[in-house]
Design a protein with these regions (language model features):
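Charged (often Lys/Glu-rich) extended helix/loop segments that serve as interaction or gating elements
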Residues: 1-279
Length: 279
């Protein structure tokens, strides 16, 4: 799983006289932020950010200044959100801050294949991490799929009390998988799912549960790239033959070595007859 977070200014950052006046102004807003000033600070920070974007597009401020303002702006937003969380009555301007500030967790699935009702009907399914349950979540996130479609995301989550715009999650550890479960989906979603971006059926497991525990009855492999391409009239065997012809010609002409040709063909076959999702 890959994640993306909004930039944040380090706590130890100090503004210098050489910094752009917009940076200095936004720093003062950030440094003096409190419950009494947060509404004015919110509007001022937005204005400074918009002004910096305009100046950057005209080449008046450089990339370093643009990055400083961006990090500081989101730091102001985080601090306002922290203060607002303790208020009994939260101003309307701050009600969507949780959604804006949430990390993005990119998950290895297609929303259109596995959860079509979520996209088409705004259906809400129970979703939660299924590991590290003995650890308190330290982040919040929205979930993104691996299609190229901007609608391939989950931004509504059910809790015991209401619907929220972010999901409590853990910081993903380097080189470690992180699994999130979607529940009460059922076979109906599988029947409705389509091959958006040519992502096929996922792997499936049939599990039986009794008083003694559980047993895995059957493992069903998901569709391969070759199978999905065949649906849209691309013959996998012909694709391999065409590549073999090109490799043979390239080796004869000295464009690639024999070892490079073999490796290229092996990688191509591995991808073609492999899973449509990341492995």
């Amino acid at each position: 799983m890959k994640t993306a977070s909004l930039p944040e200014m380090p706590e130890e950052f100090e503004v210098s006289p050489e910094d752009h006046e917009l940076v200095q102004e936004l720093y003062q807003i950030w440094d003096n932020l409190n419950q009494r000033t947060m509404l004015e600070a919110w509007h001022d920070a937005q204005q400074i950010r918009e002004e910096s974007l305009d100046l950057f597009s005209h080449g008046i401020v450089d990339l370093k200044t643009r990055a400083q303002i961006e990090r500081m702006y989101w730091s102001v937003c985080r601090e306002i959100n922290r203060i607002a969380a303790g208020l009994k009555h939260v101003p309307d301007e701050f009600r969507n801050l949780d959604k804006l500030l949430a990390d993005k967790y990119f998950c290895n699935f297609s929303l259109f294949q596995s959860l079509p009702d979520l996209w088409a009907l705004d259906q809400i399914f129970p979703i939660m991490p299924i590991q590290r349950l003995d650890e308190r979540p330290d982040r919040t996130a929205t979930l993104q799929d691996i299609t190229c479609d901007s609608d391939g995301k989950i931004t509504n989550f059910v809790t015991s009390r209401s619907v929220t715009h972010d999901l409590p999650v853990h910081t993903v550890k380097a080189k470690e998988s992180y699994y999130i479960g979607v529940f009460l989906v059922g076979a109906y979603q599988e029947i409705l799912g389509d091959m958006h971006n040519l992502f096929g059926d996922t792997n499936a497991v049939h599990v039986s549960v009794d008083d003694k525990g559980y047993s895995i009855d059957q493992v069903i492999d998901g569709e391969t790239v070759a199978e999905v391409l065949d649906y849209v009239q691309y013959n996998p065997k012909k694709l391999v033959r065409n590549l073999e012809t090109w490799v043979t010609k390239s080796v004869k002409e000295g464009k690639i070595s024999l070892e490079e040709g073999k490796e290229f063909l092996a990688n191509y076959r591995s991808g073609l007859y492999g899973y449509t999702y990341l492995e």
